[in-house]
Amino acid sequence: DWSSDVCSSDLIGERTAEEIKMQIGSAMPMTNDRDAEVRGRDLVTGLPKTVVLTAAEIREALDDVVTRMIDSVKECLAVTPPELAQDLLTRGIYLVGGGALLRGLPERLQYETKVPVQLSPQPLEAVVLGAGHCIENYQALRGMFMDARR
């Protein structure tokens, strides 16, 4: 997790790291890239310090995490049954969760996988809404679930 990695240096707090990621972070260069002024602690002197971080610096710091995400998607696609692969090419991949909000992630994932990618209409709530749907419709959907006892 990028926020924890940055915070382990004690330069800034985890909340500040998350705010920076949301403000200027991206998965690829964007036309509206900007800088952010960050207040933290100098690691050498221990004194408060203000630095300016560029979108390119944040993108570089995020790149390992983004690359791992994309590699995981590619691994899943490589073992996807043909009939499901057809469906993916037609309907695409929907990104959910907080990480899906990283600017440029849908575009980069689509570029690297050649599969249409879009952001879920409610990315922060999509997983819990989907789980709720499965619970409400368990009888109709139970054939889709694996038996954990196997």
Regions found by a protein language model. Give the residues of each.
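Phosphate-binding glycine-rich/basic clefts of nucleotide- and phosphate-handling proteins
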Residues: 5-63, 78
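Interdomain boundary/hinge elements
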Residues: 11-15, 87, 121-123, 145-147
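Residue-level signature of catalytic and energy-coupling elements of molecular machines
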Residues: 73, 95, 131
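Phosphate/ATP-binding catalytic cores across multiple sugar-kinase/actin-like superfamilies
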Residues: 61-89, 134-137
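Glycine-rich phosphate-binding loops at beta-strand->alpha-helix junctions
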Residues: 25, 85-109
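Short flexible coil/turn linkers enriched for glycine and charged/polar residues
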Residues: 30, 45, 87-89, 111-113
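Short, small-residue-biased leader/transition segments that mark boundaries at the very start
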Residues: 1-8, 70
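Conserved phosphate-binding/catalytic loops in two-lobed NTP-binding clefts
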Residues: 107-133, 141, 147-148
